[in-house]
């Protein structure tokens, strides 16, 4: 009897283990998707509600949509109609809202200036202007804009864009800012005298921003302690202002997402991941490897090296999967949900993506067990093939 029982018991145990393994595999988390709908800036929407709904309906047949980020036209009726459709399908709708830039059409905000009190080159040349990140009136103006123009449109949350200073798109003046009197006081409270920073730059030039060490995950270490202190303080100052706005939106019962630069470039624009991820429901780091325009990782890094050619220690960086994984590793410990932004739009000269590139990026993200992807940056114009590959 014992001899008969042992093989039966062994077989039964194996069946249980096999079923357990099979069940575990079937329960592997599937990626969730956030899509963005760009309908124009403050003017009449570039798409009708019916066009947007039809597009979202077709996309939802290819992939599961969890959230839709839409903005930032002032047409309330579009949001109400789209929101009604989304809520019928248990999809959250978030307002796409810029914080520190592109608000001059609707708000009287004070501008950001470099450490010499000058408007950075990007705005002087006709680009959009960035605003001071510490002026309390600037912050309250954006909250007031939401309350006046969007609070009755059915939004479940707000996705804050432009939560940074200028980048090297504006040259060195884009990152050595803001130097207004208010920001000067904030830097002083962080132990940084901006007069000393100005003097160091004027004396050392590009070498002031040299780095002594680079690690793909932990980022750059500045050779000059004053440069390190400046960017540490800048990250605290800008990110704490963003946190204050996020907290105010949370008090209104809203979910909050943040649009972030890739971790290796974030310190230059004042984004401290540790602070920001504690005040957001989710972050969308822009891990754009194929974008040859602002926010593209390679594009921004090339601008850095061109802006400070005399700085030492900046290595060649290949925008391959290994580098993508280093950026995913850098944000792995952030306590909020993580939806890396992967570009799915296509334009031969600016964003030459492919279905293979999109699928490759998804695979890397899911190896880190992140929540999913933010499909950037306008689902209305993305090729279907770049979406369908995600559902396979």
Q: Would you name each region that the model predicts?
A:
Residues 103-133, 171-228:
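Aromatic- and acidic-residue-enriched carbohydrate-binding clefts of CAZyme catalytic domains
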Residues 191-349:
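Glycoside hydrolase catalytic-domain groove-lining segments
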Residues 41-45, 65-73, 124-143, 224-239, ...:
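The substrate-binding groove and active-site-proximal loops of carbohydrate-active enzymes
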Residues 26-55, 343-345:
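Boundary/entry segment of secreted carbohydrate-active catalytic domains
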Residues 83, 94-153, 170, 239, ...:
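Active-site-adjacent "subsite" loops/lids of carbohydrate-active enzymes
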Residues 130-169, 173, 248, 273-276, ...:
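An active-site-proximal structural segment forming one wall of the substrate-binding cleft
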Residues 45-78, 152-157, 282-286, 364-374:
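Catalytic domains of carbohydrate-active enzymes, especially glycoside hydrolases
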Residues 43-61, 137-149, 265-276, 351-366:
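Short, acidic/polar
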């Amino acid at each position: 009897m014992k001899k008969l029982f042992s093989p039966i018991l062994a077989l039964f145990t194996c069946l249980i283990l096999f079923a357990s393994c099979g069940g575990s595999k079937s329960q592997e988390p599937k990626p969730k998707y956030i899509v963005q709908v760009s309908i124009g800036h403050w003017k009449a929407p570039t798409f009708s509600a019916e066009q947007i709904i039809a597009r979202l309906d077709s996309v939802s047949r290819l992939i599961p949509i969890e959230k839709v980020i839409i903005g930032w036209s002032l047409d309330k009726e579009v949001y109400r109609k789209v929101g009604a459709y989304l809520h019928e399908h248990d999809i959250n709708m978030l307002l796409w809202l810029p914080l520190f830039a592109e608000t001059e059409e609707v708000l009287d905000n004070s501008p950001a200036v470099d450490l010499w009190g000058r408007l950075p080159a990007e705005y002087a040349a006709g680009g959009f202007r960035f605003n001071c990140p510490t002026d309390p009136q600037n912050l309250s103006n954006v909250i007031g804009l939401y309350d006046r123009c969007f609070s009755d449109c059915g939004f479940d949350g707000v996705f804050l864009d432009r939560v940074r200073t200028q980048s090297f798109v504006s040259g060195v003046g884009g990152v050595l800012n803001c130097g207004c009197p208010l920001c000067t006081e904030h830097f002083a409270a962080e132990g940084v005298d901006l007069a000393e920073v100005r003097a160091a730059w004027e004396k050392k030039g590009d070498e002031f921003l040299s780095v002594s060490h680079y690690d793909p995950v932990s980022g750059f270490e500045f050779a000059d302690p004053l440069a390190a202190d400046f960017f540490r303080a800048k990250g605290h100052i800008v990110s704490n202002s963003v946190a204050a706005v996020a907290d105010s939106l949370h008090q209104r019962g809203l979910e909050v997402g943040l649009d972030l630069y890739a971790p290796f470039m974030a310190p230059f624009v004042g984004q401290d991941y540790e602070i920001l991820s504690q005040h957001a429901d989710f972050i969308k780091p822009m891990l754009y490897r194929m974008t040859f325009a602002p926010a593209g990782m390679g594009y921004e890094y090339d601008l850095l090296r061109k802006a400070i050619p005399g700085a030492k220690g900046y290595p060649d960086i290949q925008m391959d999967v290994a580098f993508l994984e280093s950026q995913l590793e850098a944000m792995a410990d952030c306590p909020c949900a993580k939806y890396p932004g992967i570009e799915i739009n296509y334009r031969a000269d600016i964003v030459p993506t492919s279905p293979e590139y999109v699928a490759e990026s998804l695979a890397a993200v899911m190896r880190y067990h992140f929540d999913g992807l933010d499909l950037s940056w306008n689902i209305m114009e993305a090729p279907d093939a770049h979406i369908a590959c995600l559902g396979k």
